[in-house]
From Swiss-Prot:
<dbReference type="GO" id="GO:0000287">
    <property type="term" value="F:magnesium ion binding"/>
</dbReference>
<keyword id="KW-0067">ATP-binding</keyword>
<keyword id="KW-0479">Metal-binding</keyword>
<keyword id="KW-0547">Nucleotide-binding</keyword>
<keyword id="KW-0808">Transferase</keyword>
<comment type="similarity">
    <text>Belongs to the ATP phosphoribosyltransferase family. Long subfamily.</text>
</comment>
<dbReference type="GO" id="GO:0003879">
    <property type="term" value="F:ATP phosphoribosyltransferase activity"/>
</dbReference>
<dbReference type="GO" id="GO:0005737">
    <property type="term" value="C:cytoplasm"/>
</dbReference>
<dbReference type="InterPro" id="IPR011322">
    <property type="entry name" value="N-reg_PII-like_a/b"/>
</dbReference>
<keyword id="KW-0028">Amino-acid biosynthesis</keyword>
<dbReference type="InterPro" id="IPR020621">
    <property type="entry name" value="ATP-PRT_HisG_long"/>
</dbReference>
<dbReference type="Pfam" id="PF08029">
    <property type="entry name" value="HisG_C"/>
</dbReference>
<comment type="function">
    <text>Catalyzes the condensation of ATP and 5-phosphoribose 1-diphosphate to form N'-(5'-phosphoribosyl)-ATP (PR-ATP). Has a crucial role in the pathway because the rate of histidine biosynthesis seems to be controlled primarily by regulation of HisG enzymatic activity.</text>
</comment>
<dbReference type="GO" id="GO:0000105">
    <property type="term" value="P:L-histidine biosynthetic process"/>
</dbReference>
<dbReference type="InterPro" id="IPR001348">
    <property type="entry name" value="ATP_PRibTrfase_HisG"/>
</dbReference>
<keyword id="KW-0368">Histidine biosynthesis</keyword>
<dbReference type="InterPro" id="IPR015867">
    <property type="entry name" value="N-reg_PII/ATP_PRibTrfase_C"/>
</dbReference>
Length: 281
């Protein structure tokens, strides 16, 4: 099975890191090459531009691909979304000069919009009943209103900082995007694809979770249970030869500080907090 992965840019490193955390160690990931093997002899990576990955998956060059939702929609490829990988979050927005007269999508009517996403922009304008010329560019989209190439732009932003630095303001949100795992419709039920989905979901499920282990007197167990309403309830094991139990539980990371303090108060001891690499639910 081939997995198409972004070959560079802000999506490459998080994608490779996720694969590593999911148990697919990538051999020679830091090297500049088109392919990379993994610890699984049946799984190979194919490195490509994020914008090209939808076509690679559509045409069967890869069974699955890791790329942005914006790229898949722009490509028009009929792919199946399997997992939102929860990184690379951004918005595609309609923006215009902050000192100009455009303040709503309707104001763009009769004007022009520069973008690297002509398909998405065309559909957005149609949905908003706006007739405007689309100026297709391949970079430096923020520059176009300032050199009179376009009245507005449709472009990707994460925080809006770059837009503000270039004297632009957001008029409307076109779509939200994040990096996701996509599959060719005919490969969704492949066993390797299902294994990959399970592995990715286990990494995502472990985010923001911690594993707590502790000892507690048998007669304080009920009090301990009240403190830790964790994932599925705590696991309790007798400690041989002692009137003590070992308690294990998964809790939200944000609750650890308060929970540990309360556990000490009710008599727990030997409290150990560890990170969780993967959590299969």
């Amino acid at each position: 099975m081939r997995i198409a992965v972004p070959n560079k840019g802000r999506l490459h490193d998080p994608s490779v890191t996720l694969l590593e955390r999911a148990g697919l160690h990538v051999e020679g990931a830091a090297e500049r090459k088109l392919y990379a093997d993994t610890v699984d002899p049946d799984v190979r990576l194919l490195f490509a531009r994020a914008a090209d990955i939808p076509q690679y998956v559509r045409d069967g060059a890869a069974a699955v691909g890791i790329t942005g939702r914006d790229q898949v929609i722009e490509s028009g490829c009929d792919l199946i979304e399997l997992v939102d990988l929860e990184f690379g979050r951004c918005q595609l927005v309609l923006a215009a000069p902050e000192d100009g007269a455009l303040s709503s999508p309707a104001d763009v009517a009769g004007g022009s919009v520069a973008t690297e996403f002509p398909r998405v922009t065309r559909q957005y304008l149609k949905d908003n009943a706006v007739d405007a010329e689309i100026v297709e560019v391949t970079g430096a989209t923020e520059l176009t209103p300032h050199v009179e190439m376009a009245d507005a732009i449709v472009d990707i932003t994460s925080t809006g900082t770059t837009l503000r630095m270039n004297g632009l303001t957001v008029i409307d949100e076109v779509l939200e995007s994040s990096v996701r795992l996509y599959a060719h419709p005919e490969r969704v039920d492949d066993s390797k694809v299902e294994q990959l989905v399970t592995a990715f979901n286990s990494v995502l499920a472990a985010e923001g979770k911690r594993y707590l282990m502790m000892n507690a007197p048998q007669d304080r167990l009920d009090a301990v249970r009240e403190v830790i309403p964790g994932l599925g309830g705590p696991t309790v094991m007798d400690v041989a030869g002692e009137d003590t139990v070992a308690v294990h539980v998964v809790v939200d990371e944000r609750d650890v500080f308060e929970i540990v303090s309360k556990l000490k108060t009710v008599g727990a001891s030997g409290i150990l907090v560890t990170e969780i690499e993967r959590l299969v639910e």
